Amino acid sequence: MDSFKVVLEGPAPWGFRLQGGKDFNVPLSISRLTPGGKAAQAGVAVGDWVLSIDGENAGSLTHIEAQNKIRACGERLSLGLSRAQPAQSKPQKALTPPADPPRYTFAPSASLNKTARPFGAPPPTDSALSQNGQLLRQLVPDASKQRLMENTEDWRPRPGTGQSRSFRILAHLTGTEFMQDPDEEFMKKSSQVPRTEAPAPASTIPQESWPGPTTPSPTSRPPWAVDPAFAERYAPDKTSTVLTRHSQPATPTPLQNRTSIVQAAAGGGTGGGSNNGKTPVCHQCHKIIRGRYLVALGHAYHPEEFVCSQCGKVLEEGGFFEEKGAIFCPSCYDVRYAPSCAKCKKKITGEIMHALKMTWHVPCFTCAACKTPIRNRAFYMEEGAPYCERDYEKMFGTKCRGCDFKIDAGDRFLEALGFSWHDTCFVCAICQINLEGKTFYSKKDKPLCKSHAFSHV
């Protein structure tokens, strides 16, 4: 152990961090250094033990006491440190250069470039597979040998055109194991590389064009390529399968088309409503409309059958009213359903006014003073007659004697000395105390309290 002393010139920061202490039962030591800091420049290293701080033994200091001691040093910090001697380095074994590095060849081989083989050909086997197969034949009983081989058959690598065991079982069940897709046959032919031969004279051998793909007929294609519902019928969860043949219905004749259109129009038109591009059907007689027609209340009508329910008048022009599902002309509706005016007792057919739980013609409900129709404006009732707001304030409005402002409806007021007062305006003319409900005196039409009854106003 090498002990040495380090003096750092202030001010802080000092560029190191402590760890350990008496409270941790671990000697104080340097845990971290700031790169380029004062401690790093003075040669302090991570892991140095702190023996003393500013001349005081650090072995009896806790972690917090050591930090406080360092903070109290001010402009000069003296540390006694101890550093473990580095262990003697062991002689290193001389490194010998490795032998020639292994060389890898990327030439094509039989294991990497396999040629295509026809369906059903056995997969290629190597020595390792043959040894494993012999070992399995020795260990596995004959009863389970076949099942093991069948279960592991799909694990062996096979070319992209090979068929899995489950697919061959499905083909055997459906009777299509000997059928072959013409598209696959054409792909086989196209994948064959033509042999290169010496060019012959053009006159001796005629040049043949490359045959294009022939369109397969529906009968020569397998059922999984022709029938889109093949996979659904032979799903694993089906207990039995039934093959059925469906024939496409013949194209309907124009007469059948016309009959279906008529039936659709008759069925859809009886319900009324919108036509949606179909032949309109009269809502009254339930017959197909040929030519002009009317649309009212969401239904189609013959023009001559859209009539008043009471007088039978054709309502093609002039407007109509609908009441409880029945249609009326204006005159019949006025006689039967129109309300009566409370003033003139006549039927109200145009604009109507509702006031005082009665109905009025708008020109009949007017101000009693200016004769102006009140319509939707505010009005006041006085002695059974309506008044507009302006005339009512002019004729019956009340002003406060104290503030000279109008006493609105709903305001609290009182009457005294022959005038009307707001309850807050009836006060003593001298001390302004409120006199509502109290004894007061009057002098020159001004209220006075009992204390100022004889004062000069």
From Swiss-Prot:
| Stretches assigned to the PDZ domain | 1-85
Domain of life of the organism in this record?
Eukaryota
Which SMART domains has this protein been placed in? LIM, PDZ
Q: Which GO terms describe its biological process?
A: actin cytoskeleton organization; cell differentiation; heart development; muscle structure development; ossification; positive regulation of osteoblast differentiation
GO CC annotation: what is one? filamentous actin
- The LIM zinc-binding domain extends over 280-338, 339-398, 399-457
Q: Which terms does the record give in the GO molecular function aspect?
A: actin binding; metal ion binding; muscle alpha-actinin binding
UniProtKB keywords: Cytoplasm, Cytoskeleton, Developmental protein, Differentiation, LIM domain, Metal-binding, Methylation, Osteogenesis, Phosphoprotein, Repeat, Zinc
- The chain residues annotated with the modification Asymmetric dimethylarginine are 103
User: Phosphothreonine (modified residue): where?
Assistant: 96
**Phosphoserine: which positions carry it?**
78, 111, 247
List the induction conditions: Induced by glucocorticoid or BMP6.
List the expressing tissues: Expressed in kidney, heart, brain, lung, and skeletal muscle. Overexpression results in the synthesis of an unidentified soluble factor which acts on cells in the osteoblast lineage causing them to differentiate and secrete BMP-2.
Q: List locations, semicolon-separated.
A: Cytoplasm; Cytoplasm, Cytoskeleton
Region entry Disordered, spans: 81-132, 186-226
The UniProt subunit note reads as follows: Binds via its LIM zinc-binding 3 domain (LIM 3) domain to endocytic codes of INSR, but not with those of IGF1R, LDLR, TFRC, or EGFR. Interacts with various PKC isoforms through the LIM zinc-binding domains. Binds to RET in a phosphorylation-independent manner via its LIM zinc-binding 2 domain (LIM 2). Probably part of a complex with SHC and the RET dimer. Interacts with TPM2, TBX4 and TBX5. Interacts (via LIM domains) with SIPA1L1.
Which Gene3D superfamilies does the UniProt entry name for this protein? Answer: 2.30.42.10, Cysteine Rich Protein
| Record's function text | May function as a scaffold on which the coordinated assembly of proteins can occur. May play a role as an adapter that, via its PDZ domain, localizes LIM-binding proteins to actin filaments of both skeletal muscle and nonmuscle tissues. Involved in both of the two fundamental mechanisms of bone formation, direct bone formation (e.g. embryonic flat bones mandible and cranium), and endochondral bone formation (e.g. embryonic long bone development). Plays a role during fracture repair. Involved in BMP6 signaling pathway.
Would I find Phosphoprotein among this entry's keywords?
yes
**In its UniProt entry, what is this protein called?**
PDZ and LIM domain protein 7
Domain notes per entry: The LIM zinc-binding 2 (LIM 2) interacts with TBX4. The LIM zinc-binding 3 (LIM 3) domain provides the structural basis for recognition of tyrosine-containing tight turn structures. This domain is necessary and sufficient for interaction with TBX5.
